[in-house]
């Protein structure tokens, strides 16, 4: 942790006061903490004795400490920001609490989906916004995991999106227009923002700002029928379930051509919903299906922000 309470009960921040003196305690549980400074982990506080503290973790990584420090330095000149703000009313600590309304959470490692849902819901029920920024262990690669889907946000101008933090390159990344193809591979665009350049809150609001709209062009996956045949041969549960559904209608997956599977690339879906998205997406999916259902040239697929699908063709 980067903050502690001094003997007068005042918050002490090691980023602003690098040489603390005296006794300090945890802002969450009240237990004694010790100031530490080493070569691997940046200066921080740690509990003197191992005990159950539901607010702060004892195995905080160097990456997590560094990223919180970078974001704090980026925000402090433009916004009211509190580092590791203890929100006792909801039993949580916000990594950074901005303008008394926005919690920025730096998540560097996996966590149970149920835990993410509970933490997000607690913020929402308290009338607070929360934005999760993902460290290296959770960066988006070729596939969207079930956990990734629970970090997704949504806007009409940038579609499904999420944020990544790179401590080595010192940059913030916006992965947007996130789609999945029928093989489960991710298709998206990326914007990069170097740490400290520009107003961070304005950057984080970008998905909802008025802007020139982007698009992404992908060729038709002509090898898709062979891929589906392989999946059925190896008894993929998802494809077997879909084949059973087709059989019930007197159809067969193996007789469909690549063009008949159009669009090959689709919006992410989640059977349990999306923890970060409170908007009803029913019309978004309907607009998407209707738009591509009217496309005659199926040799390519151009992916647009959802606002485009709502406009008459």
Language-model features and meaning:
Residues 89, 111-112, 138:
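Acidic, metal-coordinating catalytic cores used for nucleic-acid/nucleotide bond scission
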Residues 115-128:
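Short, charged, amphipathic alpha-helix that recurs within catalytic cores of restriction-modification
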Residues 126-158:
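Nucleic-acid nuclease catalytic cores
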């Amino acid at each position: 942790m980067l903050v502690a309470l001094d003997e007068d009960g005042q918050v002490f921040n090691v980023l602003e006061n690098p040489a603390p003196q005296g006794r300090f305690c945890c802002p969450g549980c009240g237990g004694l903490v010790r100031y530490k400074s080493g070569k691997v982990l940046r200066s921080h506080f740690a509990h003197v004795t191992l005990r159950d503290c539901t607010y702060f973790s004892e195995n905080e990584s160097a990456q997590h400490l560094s990223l919180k420090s970078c974001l704090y330095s980026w925000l402090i000149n433009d916004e009211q920001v509190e580092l590791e703000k203890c929100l006792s009313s909801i039993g949580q600590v916000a990594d950074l609490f901005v303008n008394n309304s926005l919690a920025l959470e730096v998540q560097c490692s996996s966590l149970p989906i149920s835990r993410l849902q509970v933490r997000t819901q607690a913020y929402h029920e308290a009338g607070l916004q929360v934005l999760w920024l993902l460290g290296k262990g959770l960066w988006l690669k070729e596939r969207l995991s079930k956990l990734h889907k629970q970090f997704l946000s949504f806007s009409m101008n940038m579609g499904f999106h999420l944020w990544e933090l790179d401590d080595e390159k010192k940059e913030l990344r916006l992965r947007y227009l996130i789609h999945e193809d029928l093989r489960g591979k991710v298709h998206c665009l990326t914007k990069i923002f170097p740490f400290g350049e520009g107003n961070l809150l304005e950057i984080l609001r970008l998905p909802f700002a008025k802007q020139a709209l982007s698009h992404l062009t992908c060729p038709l996956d002509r090898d898709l029928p062979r891929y589906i045949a392989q999946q059925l041969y190896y008894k993929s549960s998802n494809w077997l379930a879909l084949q059973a559904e087709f059989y019930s209608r007197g159809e067969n997956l193996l007789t469909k051509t690549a063009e008949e599977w159009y669009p090959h690339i689709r919006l992410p879906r989640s059977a349990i919903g999306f923890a970060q998205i409170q908007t009803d997406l029913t019309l978004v999916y309907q607009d998407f299906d209707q738009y591509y259902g009217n496309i005659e040239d199926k040799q390519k697929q151009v992916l647009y922000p959802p606002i485009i699908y709502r406009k008459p063709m």
